[in-house]
Amino acid sequence: MSQKERPTFHRQEVNKTIWEVPVRYQNLSPVGSGAYGTVCSAYDEKTGLKVAVKKLSRPFQSIIHAKRTYRELRLLKHMKHENVIGLLDVFTPATSLEEFNDVYLVTHLMGADLNNIVKCQKLTDDHVQFLIYQILRGLKYIHSADIIHRDLKPSNLAVNEDCELKILDFGLARHTDDEMTGYVATRWYRAPEIMLNWMHYNMTVDIWSVGCIMAELLTGRTLFPGTDHINQLQQIMRLTGTPPASLISRMPSHEARTYINSLPQMPKRNFSEVFIGANPQAVDLLEKMLVLDTDKRITAAEALAHPYFAQYHDPDDEPEAEPFDQSFESRELDIEEWKRQTYEEVISFEPPVFDGDEMES
């Protein structure tokens, strides 16, 4: 949103708050809200697309908020891939840094998420291939920029009528202990090493989540619906078996080592007996994803080349990302400086070239 071509704004009340948006965005209608903002669907007169407009709530109320706002904007600006949600527009009604207080982000409006899809029907193997292929294609891109999603689950995967998929909300997930407690989907898809702080985790935490999602698509039910952290780990180990000594010895946490050593030894189950009737190639891939040892877990790039995706895999059309500068993560700045840098990012945004063939949901 460069200064020289500032659009005309109009105001609209949404859920008792005033939204001030460029006139190109019409018919604002609330579709959801969370801790970090409210989302409206809107019609973009400029492109003819239905879009999602997110107004961040109190983006600069604290250093944590301000840094999170900066992080979300930087991540969204960086992502340019068919299977990852990207930024169509970002704007503020403010005309100067001094009055800069509100940030609005515009992305594609996606019709449904994977949760809706799973509930409605048991998917064919071909559907599962196509959906998981797209998740892995998006993950290969995200991971190549050294970004970890950390919170992949069906509700973070948007799908349209044509089964085209985009990954949402990556790189932001920093859940509180409270949100991870009890019988909650936030935790069911989490890799054990991140759930229990076993060790420094890597990109493959996301692959664990893909394994959980894929198993659910194949069977129509949640793979590890734990009632709490301990029950969840028990459910996981009933399938994977208890970790081998070689893995336990590499866990830096003394507490984790002691706890796992206290558990009764369990053997790994035969996956083809657990996933009866599934495509043997699907079962083979699940075995390579749902591995406790992160060093042995398959990567997104490796998984794309697995025979299960033979009809979709194209090594020349599985792009990687430009490097993403994350040096800001270690910076300790005050609110005003995070705000100034966020304002710079808003001003410097260049919208994607619209080709008229965009994904409609």
Swiss-Prot record:
Enzyme class, one word?
A: transferase
What PROSITE patterns does UniProt report for this protein, alphabetically?
Answer: MAPK, PROTEIN_KINASE_ATP, PROTEIN_KINASE_DOM
Q: Where in the cell is it found?
A: Cytoplasm; Nucleus
Q: Where is this motif: TXY?
A: 181-183
User: What regulates the activity here?
Assistant: Activated by threonine and tyrosine phosphorylation by the dual specificity kinase, MKK6.
Changes after translation: Dually phosphorylated on Thr-181 and Tyr-183, which activates the enzyme.
Q: Which family does it belong to?
A: Belongs to the protein kinase superfamily. CMGC Ser/Thr protein kinase family. MAP kinase subfamily.
The entry's protein name is Mitogen-activated protein kinase 14A
Organism listed in the record: Cyprinus carpio
